Regions:
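Cell-wall polysaccharide-cleaving catalytic domain and substrate-binding groove, primarily
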Residues: 1-175
Length: 175
């Protein structure tokens, strides 16, 4: 079975909440322990939520402090080292900024984070990461939810007697 962050199209394995809702999440599933994972319709929406959450809650912190907060203090030194190894410009003391998140290294950072969360490479293309970044920072619109066929209203059926009575009445109506 695929990791929950892949099944939910939630690359950061983020919890449900206002940010997840802003980017289209309408439900969540349990994802181990007492954790919850927001569910997204597209990978780009999940990525956009991840970028936005980092931009609003994890900037002006060092990489080490931001990962410590993000992970709920779970394996944070290893997690931060994993991230720093994949983005050459990062060190444990790098202060996370919105400018960094908007940059080419910003989406590479999110891509690395998704790999840590999934435990394997995340199934998103670089173009999907860029699109998520554009959505998060207002350079692209949030895609509409996938079309769902409306359930047709039931059509009332008439009994044979009701139809016969209506027919007979119609014979006596004046035209």
């Amino acid at each position: 079975m695929e990791p929950v962050s892949i099944r939910t199209k939630n690359p950061g394995a983020m919890w449900p909440g206002p940010v997840a809702t802003k980017f289209g999440s309408t439900e969540w599933i349990p994802c181990g322990g007492n954790n919850k994972c927001a569910v997204f319709s597209t990978f780009e929406q999940g990525a956009a939520a991840q970028f936005y959450l980092w931009a609003t809650k994890y900037t002006q912190m060092t990489l080490a402090d931001a990962i410590h907060k993000w992970s709920g203090h779970n394996s944070s030194p290893e997690y931060a080292a994993f991230m720093a190894k994949r983005i050459p410009s990062l060190t444990m003391d790098t202060v996370m900024t919105v400018a960094f998140l908007k940059s080419e290294n910003g989406w590479r950072f999110m891509k690395a984070q998704s790999q840590w969360e999934a435990g394997k490479p995340y199934p998103m293309t670089d173009d999907q990461w860029r699109r998520g970044q554009e959505i998060a920072f207002g350079r692209a619109a949030i895609p509409p939810p996938p079309d769902i066929e409306p359930i047709p209203e039931p059509v009332p059926t008439k009994s044979i007697w009701q139809a016969l009575i209506e027919f007979i009445i119609s014979l006596f109506r004046r035209k």
